[in-house]
Swiss-Prot record:
GO terms for cellular component: cytoplasm; ribonucleoprotein complex; ribosome. It holds the Pfam family Ribosomal_L35Ae. Belongs to the eukaryotic ribosomal protein eL33 family. The lineage of its organism: Eukaryota, Metazoa, Chordata, Craniata, Vertebrata. It is found in: Cytoplasm. This is Large ribosomal subunit protein eL33. One of its GO terms (biological process) is translation. GO terms for molecular function: structural constituent of ribosome; tRNA binding. Component of the large ribosomal subunit. It comes from Ictalurus punctatus (Channel catfish). Component of the large ribosomal subunit. The ribosome is a large ribonucleoprotein complex responsible for the synthesis of proteins in the cell. Gene3D superfamilies: translation elongation factor selb, chain A, domain 4. Keywords: Cytoplasm, Ribonucleoprotein, Ribosomal protein, RNA-binding, tRNA-binding.
Length: 110
């Protein structure tokens, strides 16, 4: 069964007011989601920012490589156009704005 167990999303920026931004919450635009009703499926799903670093790190059960991941979770909807809010274990770096986030299709709530 080929295929991926994640949906594509873009990190649009941080949760913010007019003058202040709150870096502890990320705003994600999930591909193919255009209304608040469609967001319900993604609530509670795990998300991951996968990136490459300069130094290698040990990966569990594998060879050391340069790939790293920051894990997070979709917490709630943001607005009426299919944006979601997500909290990550450590805040996403600003260089990640506009880059791909993986929204995993687990855990299932069905």
């Amino acid at each position: 069964m080929p295929g991926r167990l994640w949906c594509k999303a873009i990190f649009a920026g941080y949760k913010r007011g007019l003058r202040n931004q709150r870096e502890h919450t990320a705003l994600l635009k999930v591909e193919g989601v255009y209304s608040r009703n469609e967001v319900d499926f993604y609530l509670g799903k795990r998300c991951a920012y996968v990136y490459k670093a300069k130094k290698t790190t040990v990966t569990p059960g594998g060879k050391p490589n340069k790939t790293r991941v920051i894990w997070g979770k979709v917490t709630r909807a943001h607005g009426n156009s299919g944006m979601v809010r997500a909290k990550f274990t450590s805040n996403l770096p600003p260089k990640a704005i506009g880059h791909r986030i993986r929204v995993m299709l687990y855990p299932s709530r069905v």
